[in-house]
Amino acid sequence: MSEGQENLRTTEVDLGGLVSVLATHLYSTPLVALRELVQNAHDSHTRRRLEDPDGSTGRPELIRVTADPARGSIAIEDTGAGLTEPEIHAYLATVGTGYTRMLREVTGSQELIGAFGLGFLSAFSVAEEVTVTTTSHREPGLGHRYRSRGGQQYTVDPAPARPRPGTLVELLLKPEHRQLADEQALREVLGRYCVLLPVPVHVGADEQPVNGVPVPWRDRPAGDPHAARMAFAAAFGRRFEPLTAFPLEPAADGSTDAVGLLWVQDGGSYGSTDNRDLAVYLRGMLLAEDARDLLPSWAGFIGGVIESNLLTPTASREDLQRDEHYRALRQALTEAVVNGLYETARLHPAAWRRILARHGQELLGAALCDDRLFTLLADDVPVPTSQGDLTAGALRAAGSGAVHVALGSGGGFEEMLYRAMRVPIARGDRYAVLPFLRRYAQLRDCRIVELGSESGNKELFREPEQPLPADQAGWLAAALAEPGERLVPARFEPVGLPLVLVPDREAELKARIEDDQADARIPSAALRLARAFTARTDGTVKARLYLNTDSPAVHDLLRAYREGHTGAATAAGLLRSVKVIMAAAASDGPAAGDLGAALAGIGTAVAALTAPAVPVDPADGLSVDLDRLLGLGESNGPDGTRGENEER
C-alpha cells in the first residue's frame, strides 16, 4: 500500500440533498422539464434506429404530449426503443448515468442529444409523482412501470405490454405548476423548443405537429429560396418583422458545422439598441434561447436560428461552454452577417433601403468595427444632421467640399449659424457620428470642420482685416457682453448675422467636474484625467461673443458711435437683446442674461426709435441711453472681458 493510502476515505453523498439541488435548482424555469422529457423521447427513436435498423424500416415515429387540466397532469409518449427492467435500474433510476451518452460513445452518432444522465431528473422539478410505463423493442411482450415520488425512492412493477415498443411518461404536477397542464400553452412552448426536431411532435389530438414548419436550410424549397427564408424568419421571430434573411453555412475549413438562418429585424426598443436575438439548437433541440453573445456586439438588429452538433452544452443544457467550437461559431456568424448585408445591398435594393432607414444609427457604429462594412456603408448610411438624415456625401456637397459636425448637442449656436448659412451640420453628439465622419474624411480626402473645437472655431471665425480701435472695442464689450463673456471681433458668414455667442466647452467641463457631486458620479481615474485636461483654463471666460466685423449692422453701429449719434445706445441695446434671445434658443448655450429683460429691451428700443426727436448733448445722451437701456453697473476691461466698473 502506497504512502497515505491507508487514510483514504470514500466521499459520502446526501442523495436527498443532491436530488433536491439537481431537480429544483439546476434549471432556470420549470418549462425546461418538458424540453428534457421530449428530448429523451427523441433520443429513444434515434436509439431504436441505431439498435434495430431492420425493425425501424417503415415504423411510424412520433412523440405526443397531452395534458389533463382536471387531473393536473401531463403525459409524454413516444414510439421509440423503450426500456428493459435492467435498463430502468441502470439508467433511468441512476443519477448521472445516461444510456444516450454511452450509445454515442459506442456508435459515434451525432443525432443523440442527451449527455449527462440528468434530463429525467428534471421531471421532479414540476411533478410530485412520476410514472413511466415502457416496453422495450428487445422484449415486445413485456411491460414495466416505474413510479417515484420525489425521485429518491422508486418502484418497478410488471405492467401490460404496450401495443408497440415505446414509453409513456406521466407527470402528476405539483400544485404550483398545474398551469402547465394546458395544451395551448404546450403548443407555444414546444413549438419553440422542438421546431427543429426531425421526429414529429404532436400536442393533444392534433394531426399537425408543432414542428411542421419547413426548415429552409434542410429542405430545398420549390420556389424562391429567399421567400422561404423570409417565411421562416417571420414565423420564428418573436418581436420584430424581418426585413431580409440570409443563410449561415458550415465553415469551409471545418471549424464549425453550424447551419441556420439570420435576419435583419425591423424594430428596436426605447431601452436599448441591442436587440440581438439568437436561438441555438443542439441536434434539433433548443439549447440556448438568448445566445446574443455569439453575434457581434455591433449587430443589435440581427435575429436568427442556428443548429450545430459540435457545440458543448452546460449541465443545465441552457447555455454553451466557451470552447474552440464556440469561438469558431462566433467568427462564422460575424462573416455571415457581413456577407449577408453585402448580398442584400446587391440583390435586394428595396430591403437595403429599409435597413438603412431603420438602422442607420447602429450601422454607423458597425461600419467602424469592420473595414468591409465601412466600404459598404460609407456612401449610403444616413447621418443625423440639422437638416434631417443625410449621407456623408450629401453633407460634403452641401458644405462646399467640407463635412461640418457639431460637437455640442443639437440646438446650439452651430445649428443656428449654419441654418442661416443653409449648410447642414452633423450631430456629433449622436452615437458613432463623429468617428465615422472623421474616418470618412480621411478616406475621401476631404476637410472635416468640428464646430465647438478650437480648430473648428478658428476656421469658422476668421481674423478681421483690421483690428478694432481700443475705444470702439471697449464700448462694444460694455454694451453687448455679460459678465463672463469675452468680445471677439471676427469675420464669419453669413454677413447678415451681426454676432453669435459661443460657449467655452472647456469651461463647461471644468464647472461640471469641479461640482461637489462629481466625485460620486465619475470614476476617480476619469476624473483625474478630466481635471488635468481642464487645468489650462481658469474658467472665468464662460463664452465668447463673436462680433461680425463684416456685418452691415455692426458697421452702422460703429459709425453711429464714432459720430456720437443718439441712437447708438438704442441700437446696441437691441443687438444685446437679440444676442440673449438667440442664446436662449440654443439648448446647450450658456446663460446670456435675463431673457425677460431682453424681451423688454426690444420694446424699449422700439419705443426709443419711434419717440419724437429731442435735441440732447451727444455725449450725455449716449451715456444716459446706455445706462437706461442696458442697466450697466459694470464695464469691460481692455481685453474685452466684463470686469469692475471703470470710466468709459
Language-model features, listed with the residues they occupy:
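GHKL/Bergerat-fold ATPase module in large chromosome/replication-associated machines
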Residues: 112, 133-153, 174-179, 184-648
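GHKL (Bergerat-fold) ATPase N-terminal catalytic module, capturing the glycine-rich phosphate-binding loop
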Residues: 1-188, 195, 406, 620-648
